[in-house]
């Protein structure tokens, strides 16, 4: 007779109960962790090690073989760990899965996870733009389409869980992982993350999105990776938890990953209040919680809240963790933890039940293998969508009329990022990610600005000069320490300080009609680059001698168009007023060169709008537009504020905004506000505007931000065309968190600020919210809507 757990016709909860009853404690523990392996299509799998293969002897192989007979919860990044072509990687993963299904006692399949923030992290997958690019499009539908394409590539290689998106809310752009965020507004982060999760998971949730880093990871001391976070619950809930709540409730996210840091002395991996009370009990999250890599071990190694690995495992799993990643450093000690009374088998059963539930839901027991002939990477649709995101995220910050370029001028294309494919990629793209492991992946699918401009203008019209290096040699274990601090340790691969190439760039400029200067940074993990995870900085000056290069180019008197790429905004130390144009393209991925060239030549409009403020200086940090009135200090600090505000971006045309109006000047606390505004294209070219609606609570029982984004809509208009935008905002969106942890809406006056950026407010309307203070229900309304009517 077929076992209940093998019967696909039985309800999932019955299958889980039957399987749990058959499992030994050791088999249960095995489901609570992953293995990080170098898989082999012949079955000679080995554990990933930083040591050379000669240290991984037969005894270790035998030990791994014995451990695998117990099964395993997950396999860590089978295609993303090393350079392997997809078909070979899938064949190797299938070989391991066949062992799980046929050579273990109960035949429980493994779940395979990969990174997928900016595309599936494996050889030959499409290299999508960064999350800052996603956010800068202000186009959730496009973000959802991008995630759909990433999901299709992931499914085609047998991936069931993607470790994305990142829901950290940017607060200090010195933080190296700023590039992974959707920006600095919590609601916009939530909107974009919700779109990404819906796209990646699909309607069936047959690929799990992973919300990370739960929570507040971006607000660490001094913007330093892993450093403590200091937040009260009101701000934690209103700013940092909000995007997670939205993605859980609106998109049914399948997984959550806690963060490395501690909040109020409690590390994220052992915080039962956040992992269980808030996430599961209050929000109704029904997926699995997976550790950030090594996060459980840090409980005793760094945080010092446990004595050993067994205690760390017990703390994390009791708090709400389901699976330790990337391997079993602490979970292997669970038997010891049970024997010592640190965790109960009842708790283990609860956790393993959740893991098995997800495997049954995913259909892994019925369809455990990937189709080796169904791999679909880099198809026409994925390339097209990646390029569309790159193009629509290009943001124009300055333009004295030189853009778009007319005809085919003689262009001096200068700068260290003009012809470097890696300069267009973010840290979690496959080629950049490999640098930390001293592996080099070819980047032929990346089109650089040089290649695109030479294609459009002709090679004879483009004179290229590198101008300077950012880092002369990319390598692992080579700290570059971006920034201005002295007293640095010996650097194996420092940021270059050589000015030897600048004269050649100046000569190129003098012999050209216009200069396109490409500057920025290089993404790399743990200081193998100037931005990225563990690559934080103390300065917002361009790395190396790029500022000197720009100054020399401006001094020629030729018009200089600056194209900045990278993972954080940088200041130009006053050159913003002297250059002819300034474009920010972030890390635009493999189609980035085309996107930049399309905007420069007028083939595309710069449609991007900033999702992180560009601070006046590093002294303003942490800086974000939705700050409090007193954030600038008393007396007001001259360095506080932004050079370019949140929501800002120029286009090719101009718009007239007619008076905003509301359907009713008074609304009840459980009602909604309808706000309308007319927009007319007064220019000579078709163009788009992002109409933004901010709300200010004029008087509240707690200190509130000066403004908060609550609605937006992009509208594209032909010359002379007018459209009416009618926004509907539930009053529930005007809420904040009271000291008792409850979300409330208070009666009173609220300003609705309608503008082209957070600083460019064109119209202000006041509404009066009436009634008594209202505590919001669990299923409160989180989204506004907009209807566009054309005249």
Predicted regions and their residues:
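Short proline/glycine-enriched turn/loop segments at secondary-structure junctions
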Residues: 740-743
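Glycoside hydrolase catalytic-domain context in secreted enzymes
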Residues: 1-735, 746-754, 758, 780, ...
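Short beta-strand elements
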Residues: 760-775
């Amino acid at each position: 007779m077929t076992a209940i757990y093998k019967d696909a016709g039985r309800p999932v909860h019955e299958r889980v109960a039957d399987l749990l009853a058959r499992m030994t404690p050791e088999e249960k523990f095995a489901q609570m962790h992953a293995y990080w392996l170098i898989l082999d299509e012949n079955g000679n799998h080995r554990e990933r090690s930083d040591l050379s293969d000669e240290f991984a002897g037969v005894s270790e192989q035998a030990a791994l073989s014995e451990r695998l007979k117990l099964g395993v919860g997950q396999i860590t990044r089978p295609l993303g760990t090393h350079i392997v072509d997809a078909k070979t990687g899938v064949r190797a993963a299938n070989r391991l899965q066949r062992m799980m299904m046929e050579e273990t006692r109960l035949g429980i399949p493994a779940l395979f996870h990969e990174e997928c923030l900016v595309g599936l992290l494996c050889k030959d997958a499409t290299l999508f733009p960064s999350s800052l690019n996603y956010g800068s499009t202000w186009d959730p539908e496009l973000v959802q389409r991008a995630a759909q394409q990433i999901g299709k590539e992931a499914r085609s290689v047998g991936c069931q869980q993607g470790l994305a998106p990142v829901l950290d809310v940017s607060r200090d752009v010195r933080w190296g992982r700023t590039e992974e965020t959707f920006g600095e507004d919590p609601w916009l982060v939530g909107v974009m993350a919700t779109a990404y999760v819906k796209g990646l998971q699909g309607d069936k949730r047959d690929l799990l999105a992973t919300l990370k880093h739960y929570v507040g990871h971006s607000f660490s001391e001094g913007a330093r990776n892993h450093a403590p976070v200091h937040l009260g619950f009101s701000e934690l809930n209103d700013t940092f938890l909000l995007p997670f709540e939205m993605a859980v409730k609106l998109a049914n996210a399948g997984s959550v990953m806690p963060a490395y840091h501690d909040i109020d002395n409690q590390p994220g991996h052992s915080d039962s209040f956040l992992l269980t009370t808030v996430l599961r009990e209050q929000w109704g999250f029904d997926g699995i919680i997976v550790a950030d890599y090594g996060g459980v071990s840090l409980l005793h190694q760094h945080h010092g809240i446990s004595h050993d690995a067994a205690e760390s495992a017990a703390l994390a799993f009791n708090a709400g963790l389901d699976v330790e990643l990337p391997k079993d450093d602490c979970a292997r000690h669970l038997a010891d933890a049970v024997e010592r009374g640190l965790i109960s088998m009842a708790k283990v059963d609860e956790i393993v039940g959740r893991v098995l539930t997800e495997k049954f839901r995913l259909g892994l027991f019925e369809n455990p293998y990937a189709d080796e002939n169904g791999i679909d990477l880099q198809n026409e649709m994925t390339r097209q969508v990646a390029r569309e995101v790159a193009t629509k995220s290009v943001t124009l910050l300055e333009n004295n009329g030189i853009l778009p370029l007319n005809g085919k001028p003689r262009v001096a294309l200068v700068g260290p990022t003009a012809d470097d494919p890696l300069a267009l990629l973010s840290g979690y793209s496959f080629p950049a990610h490999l640098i930390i492991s001293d592996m080099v992946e070819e980047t032929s699918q990346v089109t650089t600005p040089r290649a695109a401009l030479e294609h459009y203008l002709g090679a004879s019209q483009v004179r290229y000069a590198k101008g300077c290096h950012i880092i002369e040699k990319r390598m692992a274990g080579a700290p570059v320490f971006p920034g201005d601090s002295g007293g640095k340790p010996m650097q194996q691969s420092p940021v270059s300080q050589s000015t030897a190439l600048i004269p050649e760039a100046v000569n190129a400029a003098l012999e050209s009609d216009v200069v396109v200067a490409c500057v920025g940074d290089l993404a790399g993990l743990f200081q193998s680059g100037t931005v990225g995870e563990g690559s934080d900085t103390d300065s917002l000056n361009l790395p190396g001698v790029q500022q000197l290069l720009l100054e020399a180019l401006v001094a020629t008197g030729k018009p200089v168009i600056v194209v900045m790429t990278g993972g954080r905004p940088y200041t130009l130390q006053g050159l913003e007023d002297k250059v002819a144009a300034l474009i920010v393209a972030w890390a635009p991925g493999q189609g980035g060169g085309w996107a930049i060239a399309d905007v420069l030549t007028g083939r595309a409009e710069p449609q991007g709008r900033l999702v992180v403020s560009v601070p006046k200086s590093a002294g303003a940090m942490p800086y974000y537009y939705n700050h409090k009135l007193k954030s600038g200090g008393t007396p007001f600090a001259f360095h506080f504020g932004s050079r370019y505000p949140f929501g800002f971006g120029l286009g090719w045309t101009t718009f007239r905004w007619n008076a905003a109006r509301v359907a009713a000047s008074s609304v009840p606390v459980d009602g909604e506000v309808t706000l309308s505004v007319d927009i007319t294209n007064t220019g000579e070219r078709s163009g788009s505007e992002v109409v933004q609606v901010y709300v200010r609570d004029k008087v509240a029982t707690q200190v509130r931000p000066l403004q908060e984004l609550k609605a937006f809509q992009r509208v594209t208009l032909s010359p002379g065309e007018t459209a009416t935008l009618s926004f509907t905002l539930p009053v529930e969106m005007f809420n904040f968190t009271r000291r008792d942890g409850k979300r409330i809406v208070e009666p009173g006056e609220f300003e609705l600020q309608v503008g082209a950026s957070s600083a460019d407010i064109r119209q202000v309307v006041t509404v009066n919210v009436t009634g008594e203070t209202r505590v919001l229900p669990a299923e409160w309304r989180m989204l506004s809507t907009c209807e566009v009517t054309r005249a």
